[in-house]
């Protein structure tokens, strides 16, 4: 925070469980994929070496589960665990590197407890078969499904303010009848 951070390489060398997440929009990245890329670049700049992409993967999956003491329920794909899964477009053969070089446009599907909550409109039948009621939204000029009503939230904010407000941390694009 504020251009200072702990010596990550030293923590890893000593076997300390290091997790990575989005802390705040003030000092961190706006989403976890951006945070992964930022952490990777920071490590390369700070230490003059690459941080293993597998280590970065663990820093956003199994390590946080251990930190919160929920590793028996979350943090890895295993029988009996909660199926919170992100499916990305495969641009690179190595899955860890693919994750570390992905951005929001790479996200094809997000499952929460095994059910779709966000994804490509090409997966419409999957959303329907799961019983998910999804709203069609635009993020970065791409049509997506989201199991929520961000449009209603944005309309409510616009109505309260009297104008359409762009929120950097909430990249949903919504057309309004009354606001340009």
Predicted regions mapped to residue ranges:
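Active-site-adjacent C-terminal substructures of enzyme catalytic domains
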Residues: 1-79, 83-93, 101-102
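Active-site microenvironment of metallo-dependent hydrolases
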Residues: 58-180
């Amino acid at each position: 925070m504020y251009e200072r951070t702990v010596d990550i390489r030293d923590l890893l060398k000593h076997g300390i469980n290091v997790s990575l997440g989005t802390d705040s929009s003030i000092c961190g990245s706006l989403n976890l994929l951006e945070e992964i890329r930022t952490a990777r670049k920071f490590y390369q700049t700070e230490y003059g070496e690459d941080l293993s992409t597998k280590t970065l993967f663990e820093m956003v999956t199994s390590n946080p589960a251990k930190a919160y003491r929920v590793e028996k329920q979350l943090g890895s794909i295993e029988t009996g665990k909660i199926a919170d899964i992100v499916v990305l477009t495969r641009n690179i053969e190595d899955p860890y590197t693919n994750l570390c070089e992905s951005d929001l446009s790479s996200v094809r599907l997000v499952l929460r407890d095994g059910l779709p909550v966000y994804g490509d409109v090409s997966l419409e039948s999957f959303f329907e078969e799961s019983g998910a009621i999804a709203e069609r939204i635009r993020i970065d000029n791409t049509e997506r499904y989201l199991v929520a009503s961000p449009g209603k939230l944005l309309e409510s904010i616009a109505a309260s303010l009297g104008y359409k407000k762009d929120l950097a941390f909430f990249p949903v694009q919504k057309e309004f009848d009354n606001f340009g």
